[in-house]
Swiss-Prot record:
Gene: NCED9
A cellular component annotation (GO) from this entry: chloroplast stroma
Phenotype on disruption: Plants exhibit abscisic-acid-deficient phenotypes in seeds, but not in vegetative tissues.
Protein name listed in UniProt: 9-cis-epoxycarotenoid dioxygenase NCED9, chloroplastic
Lineage: Eukaryota, Viridiplantae, Streptophyta, Embryophyta, Tracheophyta
Keyword presence, DNA-binding: no
Job description of the protein: Has a 11,12(11',12') 9-cis epoxycarotenoid cleavage activity. Catalyzes the first step of abscisic-acid biosynthesis from carotenoids. Contributes probably to abscisic acid synthesis for the induction of seed dormancy.
Length: 657
């Protein structure tokens, strides 16, 4: 019965391919764009970043992947630890693939077009012949599988490879889904690194810095077999521990349900939410994944997420998060190493996914969070946890359609929820497009809801035209004007992280004022010059209260981070700290040094020298913007996402499970 499902799925895929007039990654046929079709651009990469390291990047995408994922490397190239995925994990050799099939078509190139090239759809007979030819001839089988499962695994691998092969012949990946672009240069993954102690330090580490700096990032375990976006990579946490002048470093995968199963299988089998779930191939991938589940080859019930985006320390738990799953509890050991305790549901209280940017009120120590659903209502829920970890009932937020909500904000009394113009429309996949689309007819708005609300009846929606903030840095109340002030980076084109564009991406630090009395809004740029500012924070001890300073990454030239900026939110004054020629970093983390001035503290940031292929952690005085100390790291640290700092006192109170 299931074999019939497989063949039927292939047949449907073939028919859909014959009817397709647009690329699976192409334009949405039902949307009208007033602006010219933008140039291929991604929030994670541009052409300059793709060519950043000539020692790593061959002339074609397939050559790049074949070279960098091979088990050997030329002695003429820098011996980066990421050049082979046959590295050991937790000192254990990777498991022999349980149903790895032969490689797909090797011809691939990077295209700058949103349109599909003219092609002749493959015949059904040709597709079946390709399936037969691609059935693996290996004798390596997972002993845990019974004969039916082994046969099903080989057939399913062959079907998947045939589909991918045909797609590559039809058109190349766009840059937003091309592995050779998305994991090029220092975005390329690294193997785990057990803890290394007594790292060399230049300068002096301030005595007040006691604890561990942890930062999350995407680090794919396996070579992608199809489309791949930076956000699709497996989560890896990098940790630098400070203990009375001694500094250590370690990096470990977060052992998600997805990663554990794919390690056993020896290949990626879970669908990649951004890089693969586009168009007809995305539909077929979902069908194949469901069929694998029917045969017991995969178990999605333990979660699908990668836990690669955010980190928060709450109630004795360090939580690694991505918005497609529950968080994962990661422990920092006494030696400074990292261990995954498992998927964390707050003692059975959390039944749904949670976004990667929960907020902790610095005074009450409560945690506030959202959960969104792209398939069924309610599309959005709000909830909170007391400082002891007790969850409130869910508050269903009324939305007409599922919306991309990566971040939100809190004030002393309110939560501020964005409902913007980037939405999920799964039927777009049937038309050959992306399920993540920009809806220009929709009006962006912010909802203001009391933190302790038991339902959404009192929520006040205020429109903010043409506003898409991927991140919100802070928000506060100004009672004298009946306004809620929101500080965020407004991004244009809004969907450029997910879909290709010709238009150059801009991220404008903005002040948005929401008048609770009139129901009107205003928006203005905080600084006069156009500088892309993304990834950063304010003093976390003042979150939800009025702050003067924000510390944000200088994503120039986009998408690389050449330094960070200390921005005076009241005057617009900007002070820049530049890492130096050929050096790039990521999110600057502000660590307060005490209860003194708001900017009293230090900036921590990973910096990578692309010429020397070496990474370091820099500590910068946030008051005078001078370098205090540099920690030389034992291995390369890829560019990543968000981090946090856990004090020595909090480390001593870690939960055991």
């Amino acid at each position: 019965m299931t074999i019939i499902t497989i063949i039927s799925g292939m047949y449907i895929y073939s028919l859909l391919s014959q009817d397709a007039h647009h690329s699976q990654y192409g334009q949405n046929t039902n949307l009208v764009l007033k602006k010219p079709i933008p140039k291929p651009q991604t929030a994670a990469f541009n052409q300059e970043s793709t060519m950043a390291s000539t020692t790593l990047l061959p002339s074609t995408s397939t050559q790049f992947l074949d070279r960098t994922f091979s088990t050997s490397s030329s002695s003429s190239r820098p011996k980066l630890q990421s050049l082979s995925f046959s590295s050991t994990l937790r000192n254990k050799k990777l498991v022999v693939p349980c149903y790895v099939s032969s490689s797909v078509n090797k011809k691939s190139s990077v295209s700058s077009s949103l349109q599909s090239p003219t092609f002749k759809p493959p015949s059904w007979k040709k597709l079946c012949n390709d399936v037969t030819n691609l059935i693996p001839k290996t004798t390596n089988q997972n002993p845990k599988l019974n004969p039916v499962q082994r046969t099903a695994a080989m057939v399913l691998d062959a079907v998947e490879n045939a589909m991918i092969s045909h797609e590559r012949r039809r058109h190349p990946h766009p840059k937003t889904a091309d592995p050779a672009v998305q994991i090029a240069g220092n975005f390329f993954p690294v193997p785990e690194k057990p803890v290394v102690h007594n790292l060399p330090v230049t300068g002096t580490v301030p005595e007040c810095i006691q604890g561990v700096y942890v930062r999350n990032g995407a680090n794919p375990l396996h070579k992608p077999v199809s489309g791949h976006h930076l956000f699709d990579g497996d989560g890896m946490v990098h940790a630098v521990r400070f203990d009375n002048g001694s500094v250590s470093y370690a990096c470990r995968f977060t052992e998600t349900n997805r990663l554990v199963q794919e390690r056993e299988c020896g290949r990626p089998v879970f669908p990649k939410a951004i890089g693969e779930l586009h168009g007809h191939l995305g539909i077929a991938k979902l069908m194949l994944f469901n069929t694998r589940g029917l045969f017991g080859l995969v178990d999605p019930t333990g979660g699908l997420g990668v836990a690669n985006a955010g980190l928060v320390y709450f109630n004795g738990h360090l939580l690694a998060m991505s918005e497609d799953d529950l968080p994962y509890h990661v422990k920092v050991t006494q030696t400074g190493d990292l261990e995954t305790s498992g998927r964390y549901d707050f003692d059975g209280q959390l039944k749904s996914t949670m976004i990667a940017h929960p907020k902790i009120d610095p005074e009450t120590r409560e945690l506030f969070a959202l959960s969104y659903d792209v398939v069924s209502k309610p599309y959005l829920k709000y909830f909170r946890f007391t400082s002891d970890g007790e969850k409130s009932p869910d508050v269903e937020i009324p939305l007409d359609q599922p919306t991309m909500i990566h971040d939100f904000a809190i004030t002393e009394n309110f939560v501020v929820i964005p409902d913007q113009q980037v939405v999920f429309r799964l039927p777009e996949m049937i038309r050959g497009g992306s399920p993540v689309v920009y809806d220009e007819k929709k009006k962006s708005r912010f909802g203001i809801l009391n933190k302790n609300a038991k339902d959404a009846s009192s929520i006040q929606w205020i429109e903010v035209p043409d506003c898409f903030c991927f991140h919100l840095w802070n928000s506060w109340e100004e009672p004298e004007t009946d306004e809620v002030v929101v500080i965020g980076s407004c991004m244009t084109p809004p969907d450029s992280i997910f879909n290709e564009h010709d238009e150059t991406l801009q991220s404008v630090l903005s002040e948005i004022r929401l008048n609770l009395k009139t129901g009107e809004s205003t928006r203005r740029p905080v600084i006069s010059e156009q500088v892309n500012l993304e990834a950063g924070m304010v003093n976390r001890n003042l979150l939800g209260r009025k702050t003067r300073y924000a510390y944000l990454a200088l994503t120039e030239p986009w998408p690389k981070v050449s330094g960070f900026a200390k921005v005076d939110l009241s005057t617009g004054e900007i002070r820049k700290y530049i890492y130096g020629e050929g050096k790039y970093g990521g999110e600057p983390l502000f660590l307060p040094s005490g209860d003194g001035e708001e900017d009293g503290g230090y900036i921590m940031v990973f910096v990578h020298d692309e010429e020397k292929v070496k990474s370091e952690l820099q500590l910068i005085n946030a008051v005078n913007m001078k370098l205090e100390a540099t920690v030389t790291l034992p291995s390369r640290v890829p560019y990543g996402f968000h981090g946090t700092f856990i004090s020595k006192e909090d480390l001593s109170k870690q939960a055991l499970c």
